[in-house]
Amino acid sequence: MAERANLVFHNKVIDGTAIKRLISRLIDHFGMAYTSHILDQVKTLGFQQATATSISLGIDDLLTIPSKGWLVQDAEQQSLILEKHHHYGNVHAVEKLRQSIEIWYATSEYLRQEMNPNFRMTDPFNPVHMMSFSGARGNASQVHQLVGMRGLMSDPQGQMIDLPIQSNLREGLSLTEYIISCYGARKGVVDTAVRTSDAGYLTRRLVEVVQHIVVRRTDCGTIRGISVSPRNKNRMMSERIFIQTLIGRVLADDIYIGSRCVAFRNQDLGIGLVNRFITFGTQSISIRTPFTCRSTSWICRLCYGRSPTHGDLVELGEAVGIIAGQSIGEPGTQLTLRTFHTGGVFTGGTAEHVRAPYNGKIKFNEDLVHPTRTRHGHPAFLCYRDLSVIIESEDIIHSVTIPPKSFLLVQNDQYVDSEQVIAEIREGTSTFHFKERVRKYIYSDSEGEMHWSTDVSHAPEFTYSNVHLLPKTSHLWILSGGSCGSSLILFSIHKDQDQMNIPFLSAERKSISSLSVNNDQASQKFLSSDFYDKKKSGSPNYSELNGIIGTSHYNFIYSTIFHENSDLLAKRRRNRFLIPFQLIQEQEKEFIPHLGISIEIPITGIFRRNSIFAFFDDPRYRRKSSGILKYGTLRADSIIQKEDMIEYRGVQKFKTKYEMKVDRFFFIPEEVHILPESAAIMVQNYSIIGVNTRITLNIRSQVGGLIRVERKKKRIELKIFSGAIHFPDKTDKISRHSGILIPPGRGKTNPKESKKLKNWIYVQRITPTKKKFFVLVRPVGTYEIADRINLATLFPQDLFREKDNIQLRVFNYILYGNGKPTQGISDTSIQLVRTCLVLNWDQDNKNSSLEEVRAFFIEVSTKGLIRDFIRIGLVKSHISYIRKRNNPPDSGWIYADHINPFYSISPKAFILQQSLRQNHGTIRMFLNSNKESQSLLIFSSSNCFRIGLFNHVKYHNVRNELIKKNPLITIKNSSGPLGTAIQISNFYSFLPLLTYNQISVIKYLKLDNVKYIFQVIHSYLIDEKGRIFNLDRYSNVVLNPFKLNWYFLHQNYHHNYCEETSTIISLGQFFCENLCIAKKEPHLKSGQVLIVQRDSIVIRSAKPYLATPGAKVHGHYREILYEGDTLVTFIYEKSRSGDITQGLPKVEQVLEVRSIDSISLNLEKRIKGWNKCITRILGIPWGFLIGAELTIVQSRISLVNKIQKVYRSQGVQIHNRHIEIIVRQITSKVLVSEEGMSNVFLPGELIGLLRAERTGRALEEAICYRAILLGITRASLNTQSFISEASFQETARVLAKAALRGRIDWLKGLKENVVLGGMIPAGTGFNKGLVHCSRQHTNTLLEKKTKNLSLFEGDMRDILFYHREFFDSSI
């Protein structure tokens, strides 16, 4: 017994952990008997004091922390600023969520840390304070909820609710807080109910896999060990964990300090020896673990170490396997039950910050960092390796080392204040939380049109998908604007300075939007174009848009209008047509059947000669059934094939058309079904069926007739031919008549019986086999066509009174070739013939290439009556270079996106509404009623996202022509077609990154290449012929850039800090909210500039969304999005909640080898690497053995570390040796591979690692195998005892396999003996005779056998030592 003089007097409060340490030291010093006597005295003292004190808890004892008010206020202020920046588009939703969580979590943690000092200073004997730190009742988390703040809560799925509960239970909760609190309470109840069974089942599986592990030997003779070092390159290993790792272990090697041996091999380590190692700073200590034990199915005393119960070496016969399983499983059960009391409070982690010790200037090497965004959207520098940051003040130079993968939050040469955060240590190096990848969907808040910058990948991720990847940080904009559900097209009179939104047609949504605002709010008249309802108003039927609407390569929409109308009046006057439309009111009065005319106007409004102007489908030539088209007889060759009925390029190609020269054609009906390859057909080929016969499970025939089945690639074509079957005699030469049309009046169906046919028939020869054949006589539908349809049937007679240049000719086109099958989709009709109106005029030989026809929509108002017309006029074009522009194939059109103009005519004014890229424009009036060709003044501009601005085209002819006529006109760079604004110059402006104050919010604006291309507006005069004039000689005044101020709002509201720069406001430019545009007043809404005038600008409101690389954008450019549509998907990593109930599934995943970052995948790579290196050095035999063994040892250490992280994060201390015994069992098998075939084991067979080694040494040949990780369930089903396996799972299968293989169970484990009622082969009082004693003479043999291994012992230890260092650094 130690002398009293040597004992230390401790005068401090001790908790449960300190009592554990005290008891272990008492046992070391005094032994078991004396310790129990001391503990009895402690127990008596405790009860005596508790009785005398009689602590009870009252509501007055719950004292709120004084600093709570301003801490919560500060967090609310930060949240408000964060919300603003999310609104401005500086941070996206995931960054906002992360930062919001960390703000409130940090606030809650500060309150929690201040709770203890506050109680200690104000009321040290407070019952709440004493209870919470006694370890007996309650813990700090529960008391924190009572007196601090309840904080962030988790919902039942473990997801965090981002609205914190600011009140504590003493103050009481508001209604909202109470509802959120109920979520957390429900999570606690769910966890207690569900997870308890999970924890219990985990315990059962753990015990199952190691129940046979019993201490049977004193020493297995191994010479291997695992190195543990208290120091590594980056930081010191925590002393507590180092002591916990070493105490109770046995040394695998002698420990030398200098030349003196301080500890011997096979010596067990106590607290005194470990303290000496720490004092002398020993570099590395090699210890024995269950991993290194050479026993196959049990364990030796020295590899296990000390028993946790009494502190001596474990006794022989101890069932250490079951103890290990219970030790790991039991904390899970206890902690699951304990979460009920904390009630689902979220626990996370805060990042570590490096702060400046005093004021000074920052200096560092910029080559070692690169710019990036932090998790919260702050601009920062990422360190590649250890970075030395120097802080210089007037008299002190201080150096700080920032570890790799950390964020530096300041710039070089920046002045920092004392305590300012200069760096953030990356999370993950200091916390134990598991990560998981989560998808976060961002939904659109408003309806509008999506725009994005060039940083978004314009090609979708997959073909036919609308998901686009984001390679750079970029903004997405939703431009406001509603789509009108009734699809109204607007034709109303607008006045000067009106802002008008022209209708745009969306091919994806098939909706037409129109909004109009008039200055004097005149009544608006609409033309109805309802898609579906024909009966109510007699409006056009837009059932199929696909044949009419085509989108070009750049996704522009055709601004075309289609109408069918019975009252088409056409008047022609001097090379013009006027085709009027009816209004809704007139259509309602008299309902006339429609002719189905569709007028088709190109995107430019320009027609070439022989262009199709309109077409209509005659319902007489419409069929609902499939069939074959035939022209006359087979000898009729008078068919002229035209390549395309549209002779210009750029429009969506129609099918090949055939111009009709014949007066009739025939249609042979047949029923066609196209079935998948795997369809079950219920009829036979060449069989005859009736109407409504079942063909497949869900298809019935509509007609009766002969079945013909043809198998093609990946599909089956089934046809039903209706008609009569004729079996000819041998004398009948019917084969000559096969496949022909027979007219009425002649035909022989039988030599004995002849009669005249009433209708045309089609004769077809069918040969099921080579010898048999018969003839099928099929009915034929006949269609007669007149040579020409007179235009008088379409338009009134007075149209043709004045013969002039422009002519409308009528052509009929058959849409299917001779003998081609026509096939309709279900419930749709097939149009066989289309009648087209073709524009033509007499060519003028002198200017043949310069003539073209332009079509305009006009509206004429006379005495209050308004009529709408399409005007078609012949004009001479001076823009002869249009067809020669360098555009992609199929793009002969001019791809400026605001070309098709809309005209309105009133007696004294001629107004052009110019459609810009965003379907907006400003109307300008230019009154000149005396002349016939009236001119129009418009404003237009280039957009930031313009494609091709005619910069590389030469226009000498055009320029010369214009200069001759009017020498005052100067064309700046180039002159494009109608309405295109010319790019004069580019202005680049970079947003400066302000570093005036560290907490200023400018740091949120770090984007990749923040660059705007600003372009300047122009005024042009455009006449009717499309000629462009710049009559404003002082136009360079307009071209000067505006000097404007802009600024960003800072956190400090007392002084607004403005940075003056020369900024150009341009059309199409996007502005974020709170930008200074004029007079140093912030613009309160974000949007896009639509109109720039000298004294004002018009902005279309828009909502910005920030997206970072890796995000996925849903929807195409300029697609209309509705409120609630998915806009972006972010994929980000999230820490799981620190609750043990969230950690338990992770422990189970690791033990069952179902981990997300599965270790088995890493094993494969490691084995391949080891095999290559080691095989090169040693040759084949040793390569597999050492490669696999080192891989297994490394993976074992990884598994132990992963499991320990979960339990340590909860403050649960489990000794490593318990986890090691479990991990040893799930990594003890190897899989025999096919390389280097062995005579002993079969490929794919699971064998023990030690057994493979011993067999290889005995046979002196290499056995090739791969390391494999078995889950605990699979390991339990691959043991030496089939009785143990059968009593665990799959009883029938296990017993059947064991019977077939003739397996023998040697009853070595505990479980099989329990099942059979035998004596359990374990227990410390077991008969010594049955225990395998270690034989000393075997050690010399082992040393001889393992001499070869000693070559690699140093290297292997180095590897393991390195791995352990890595583990230590993460603790």
Swiss-Prot record:
Subcellular location: Plastid, Chloroplast
Top-level taxon of the source organism: Eukaryota
GO cellular component, one term: DNA-directed RNA polymerase complex
Enzyme class: transferase
Cofactor remark from the record: Binds 1 Zn(2+) ion per subunit.
Binding positions for Zn(2+) per the UniProt entry: C220, C293, C300, C303
Keywords, alphabetical: Chloroplast, DNA-directed RNA polymerase, Metal-binding, Nucleotidyltransferase, Plastid, Transcription, Transferase, Zinc
GO molecular-function terms, A-Z: DNA binding; DNA-directed RNA polymerase activity; zinc ion binding
Cofactor(s) demanded: Zn(2+)
SUPFAM superfamilies named in the record: beta and beta-prime subunits of DNA dependent RNA-polymerase
Keyword Plastid: yes
E.C. number: 2.7.7.6
InterPro entries: DNA-dir_RpoC2_beta_pp, RNA_pol_beta''_euk, RNA_pol_Rpb1_3_sf, RNA_pol_Rpb1_4, RNA_pol_Rpb1_5, Rpb1_funnel_sf
Catalytic activity as recorded in UniProt: RNA(n) + a ribonucleoside 5'-triphosphate = RNA(n+1) + diphosphate
Major localisation: plastid
Subunit structure: In plastids the minimal PEP RNA polymerase catalytic core is composed of four subunits: alpha, beta, beta', and beta''. When a (nuclear-encoded) sigma factor is associated with the core the holoenzyme is formed, which can initiate transcription.
Family note: Belongs to the RNA polymerase beta' chain family. RpoC2 subfamily.
Listed name of the protein: DNA-directed RNA polymerase subunit beta''
Organism: Arabis hirsuta
Designated gene of the protein: rpoC2
